[in-house]
Amino acid sequence: MITAIVQFALPSPISLEEAARRFQSSAPNYKNLPGLIRKFYLRSEDGRRVGGVSLWESRQAAEAVYTGEWRARVQQHYGSTPEIAWFDTPVVVDNGAGKITKAA
């Protein structure tokens, strides 16, 4: 498994309500994506940065989504270019499901 942390600075701060509205509008694009295990949307407390943390089955699955077209869509929607940081994710603790998952 791999975790992608995507962040981008906004041209101007947005409220939590506006961030939630924008996130809700893009969320259906990520539903049932091959290889995506979980996605969390993020907004900094000052509203100047937004992004997401996504847990993927593999980097290959993530890179199939984070294409030039995806970057252009983010740029158009938020007015900023996304930055992606990659992290190997060998173990996940899921208290909601009551399980610990180890990467294959």
Identify the meaning behind each predicted range.
Residues 70-72:
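Glycine-rich, phosphate-binding/catalytic loops in enzymes
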